[in-house]
Amino acid sequence: GGYLPRNYINFDQSVAACKKKGAGWHLNQTGVFAYLNLLSQKMSTVPHGNTNYGKDYYHPYERGTMPQGETQRTLTGSGQPTWYHNHDMSGIADINGNLWEWTGGLRLMNGEIQIIPYGNSMKLDCDMSASSTLWKAIKPDGTLVEPGTAGTLKIDRTSASDATLRINTSVTTQTTDSNDTSEVFKNVKAVSGVAIPKLLVALGLFPDSGVTGYGNDRFWARNNGERLPIRGSAFYNTSNSGPSALYLNNPRSYLNDLIGFRSAFVE
């Protein structure tokens, strides 16, 4: 801890930076990020964080450490114990706020939800490129199938005039590069008749019916083109912030001052 998190880095650069550290190191997997969030919900320790330019939006007396001249990011792990996933300094810090984080193993392709399953995105030789054959789509019963298979789960916009995000097995309204679809995460629903497998909950793409601690964390997406996830909100998200916040709007080449990444290690 105690470092200023890196920003201005795109998805592929984040993957490469993690792999450069050697065997076992990888871009934090989207399912692990979602697991930490679900764990904190079950333990009633939903983490606070830097969601309002150095302080927690809902608990403004809680502040992280900012180096001189910095107005956005706080040093990693420099917040209160409540800024850790278990509300204790032994936990994982900053999964809520500070910077949005690229995560591995999940993407949208023209709205179709695709994953690299079985933790394979943690492997040093995993190909997460746009053309990788490792990507799989998901049927409503949780079966993994080849991308483009009929009836797979997709992110859909309700209509041209209604930007509400929903889960569907087809895309009825496609977004453009200048608009999107969104919903407060806890309110995300499937179209009538579309079943939601537990896998979607485990991926942090659908709320767990047993959880009551979800805040106003928001889920944004674009269902045109390839979109890679950033998770956990950032220093400016204020009332839309939270560990369930998810932004599936950006292409893999995108970078700015709001987005960073987290490397993780597995043996």
Task: Give the location of each predicted region.
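Active-site loop architecture of trypsin-fold serine endopeptidases
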Residues: I115
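Disulfide-stabilized, aromatic/cysteine-rich ligand-recognition loop
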Residues: P5-A16, A23-G24, N28, M109, ...
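Short aromatic-cysteine micro-motif
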Residues: G1-I95, D125
